[in-house]
From Swiss-Prot:
Pathway: Cofactor biosynthesis; NAD(+) biosynthesis; deamido-NAD(+) from nicotinate D-ribonucleotide: step 1/1. The keyword rRNA-binding does not apply. The keyword Transferase applies. Catalyzes the reversible adenylation of nicotinate mononucleotide (NaMN) to nicotinic acid adenine dinucleotide (NaAD). This is Probable nicotinate-nucleotide adenylyltransferase. Belongs to the NadD family. It catalyses: nicotinate beta-D-ribonucleotide + ATP + H(+) = deamido-NAD(+) + diphosphate. It comes from Cellvibrio japonicus (strain Ueda107). One of its GO terms (biological process) is NAD biosynthetic process. Its EC number is 2.7.7.18. Keywords: ATP-binding, NAD, Nucleotide-binding, Nucleotidyltransferase, Pyridine nucleotide biosynthesis, Transferase. Pfam families: CTP_transf_like (PF01467). GO terms for molecular function: ATP binding; nicotinate-nucleotide adenylyltransferase activity.
Length: 211
């Protein structure tokens, strides 16, 4: 049977319970063999993070210590330059070979602007895309992203039939937690306990992050 690997990229500034639950639910719902969380160094399409790449990677490692079903991929942090998904997928394809099904997971908000990504037309030559429905966001009714979806939309079962090339839309359970709100809580002197893993909250306190 074709091996499958899920990839969940993000800034993770900081990693929180919502990230972890979503990654685990995607792995289980799609019946993936593995799921890697892949923090970016410098996000190409977002504001600069409040914590350094090293600090965000450390928080992610602390969070995943209690979840053996999830793992971390630090290739984008190690690049020490702007992160482009197409570069990471190209590296993974070279490492894992042509048979492994790569499944890159992203939100509706990110997918809606996919045509602004670096070399976006190459993404489906390297991986499948799983688009996670997010409340308040929708895919444009016209334009290149809508055309791409119409040409490549498929069912979850197709993720094992080919190594790349399909777009699957999913509406998993989403916890209403955001990294922005967590940073705002900390900045206001309040505790984000139970929104982030205890080990992450302890590290944030030690490093005096987001104050």
């Amino acid at each position: 049977m074709r091996p499958t690997l899920g990839l969940f990229g993000g800034t993770f500034d900081p990693i929180h319970i919502g990230h972890l639950r979503l990654a685990l639910e995607l792995k289980q719902q799609l019946q993936l063999d593995g799921m890697r969380l892949m923090p970016c160094h410098l996000p190409a399409h977002r504001d600069q993070p409040g914590a350094s790449s090293t600090q965000r990677a450390t928080m992610l490692q602390l969070a995943l210590a209690a979840c053996p079903e999830l793992s971390i991929d630090l290739r984008e942090v190690a690049r020490a330059r702007a992160s482009y998904t197409v570069d990471s997928l190209s590296e993974l394809r070279a490492e894992l070979g042509a048979e492994t099904s790569l499944v890159f997971c992203l939100g509706t908000d990110s997918f809606a602007g996919l045509d602004r990504w670096h070399r976006w037309q190459e993404l489906l030559q390297l991986a499948h895309l799983v688009v996670v429905e997010r409340p308040g966001w929708d895919i444009p009714s016209t334009g290149p992203v809508r055309t791409l979806l119409a040409q490549h939309q498929g069912a979850p079962g197709q993720l094992r039939l080919a190594a790349c090339g399909s777009i699957v839309r999913l509406a998993p359970r989403l916890l209403p937690i955001s990294a922005t709100e967590i940073r705002q809580l900390i900045g206001a002197g309040q505790s984000p306990q139970f929104l982030v893993p205890d080990s992450v909250w302890q590290y944030i306190g030690q490093e005096r992050l987001y104050r």
